[in-house]
Structures are given as C-alpha cells and as structure tokens.
C-alpha cells in the first residue's frame, strides 16, 4: 500500500463558526483570523494505492462555481487537485474509486466538472462512494444545511451511473429539519460505528452523525499503524479538545460524544490522525494530559 497527501488549496471560513462556543481570545491563538474574522483552512485529500485500486478520499471545492461563490470563501494557494495528483504521477483518469466522506461542497466539489454547458464526472473511470442515509440527507436538505449541499456537485454523480453506496447500518436521525419540523428534533445519540468498506482489505470506516448525518471517516491499516482520515469530526488538531465543536455541526452534543469515544480509542491504540482542514498540521498522534487527550507528535504522512 502507498498513501499520498493530496493538497487542493486553501480556503477561508469564519473563525467563530469553526470554533463554536470557544471564545475568540482563545481560538485566535490557534488559527489567527484576518480583518474579516476569517481563518485559513486546508483542503487536504488522501490518495490510497492498494490491491490494484487508486482510491481518492474527498476532492476539495473544485473550480466550476462562479466568481461570487469563490469570493465568499477566498480560495487561495498554488495547490490544485490536478497538480497534486500529477506530482505523484497520476491523473484523474487513473482514479478507480472516489470515497466521499460527506457531500458538503468543500469535500465533494471536485467530483463534477463543467464541459461546455454539461456537468460531468471529473473521474470518468471511477466509482463514487457515499451511503444511502447521507445521500438522502444531502438531496433532501434541511434549511440550515442546504447551502452546503450544492445540487450541481451531487445530482450529476447519480445521473452518471457511477454512484454506489456503502452499507451503513444503524438508526438514522429520522428527522427533517425544515421549517415544519423545527420542534421535532430527536435525541441524537452517538453513532460511532465501524464498517467494512469491501473495497480493499486494509480500508474500513467509521460512520458519525454529529456534523452531518452518516459522515464516513476512512480507517486505514498502513505499515503496522492505523490512520484515520478525520474529515469534519476533527477538522484540525486545534479541534481535539472536547468543547471545540464547530457551529456548523447539526448535532453538537452528538459530535461531543463521538469525539470522546474516538479520542479514547485512538489514544489507547496509538492511531495516526490525518487532518483534512488543518492549515499546518497534516498528521498527529495523541497523548493523555491533565487537561484530557491532546495532540502529541506532529508529522507529515510521508514520514511514516
């Protein structure tokens, strides 16, 4: 097996939204904001080469949205998906599978490209993987989350015939958060469960539902270590402390429970955490401190 970090650029999000109830006087020391209160975040994907497959985990924001859209998110940096793939000797046509942790625009925007007036898969030889629960959540979005689920990123995947679903068992949230149901929020318990991907023998995944329903976190056995792609359960190393939960999360108390369960397991088993959005830290391990579980060693994926 070979693993490659695939950087697709950086973007900006409001620091308050990214750190939730944590005061700016604290989080601003971790990721300093600009004059508009915006912090810079990475769009870091993962490429897995194993058993004759080339699996891309997430694919960034893409480039098909208009200037106004990108103006909201300040896409910046020299890295692109194409450049980063080429750096390792690959192109989009080499990708056999695209593993979508979830369908927010900054994770799946590179799935679809424009060819003239048509929207077509960027990875023409690949199978795109989601799960039925999350697909339904994304294609029938609640009003709070709707702006993150862009139809042009999602629907053409199904229309292409290249979409398949992983089997994610367990109880769904069972709720629509539209205006008619705002008083019907459920008790949303922790859903940290592990599933076999059946793609390659060394790849399984967690499903978690605090950030969005049935998000998937790849769990990879590599060189005797376990690497977990954190997606938006822990978007950065700064989010390791339990109260550091994004305001974007649909069910923050569920996130809190999922983080606690995951961090305990990860610390006990010396997992390597791979961060999708940390602007500086690619990977870290964990240690127990007086304040709880915190980051320990920090390193690049290629150093493993």
Regions found by a protein language model. Give the residues of each.
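Zn-dependent metallo-beta-lactamase
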Residues: 1-56, 61-65, 69-72, 169-170, ...
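Active-site gating loops and adjacent loop-to-helix segments of metal-dependent hydrolytic enzymes
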Residues: 22, 67-68, 233-249, 290-298
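Short amphipathic alpha-helices and their capping/turn segments at secondary-structure boundaries
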Residues: 43-51, 84-89, 118-120, 217-228
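Residue-level marker for buried hydrophobic side chains located in beta-strands
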Residues: 55-57, 99, 128, 227-229, ...
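Metallo-beta-lactamase
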Residues: 62-63, 73, 76-79, 84-90, 94-106, 122-187, ...
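Metal-dependent catalytic neighborhoods of phosphoester/phosphodiester hydrolases
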Residues: 108-118, 285-286
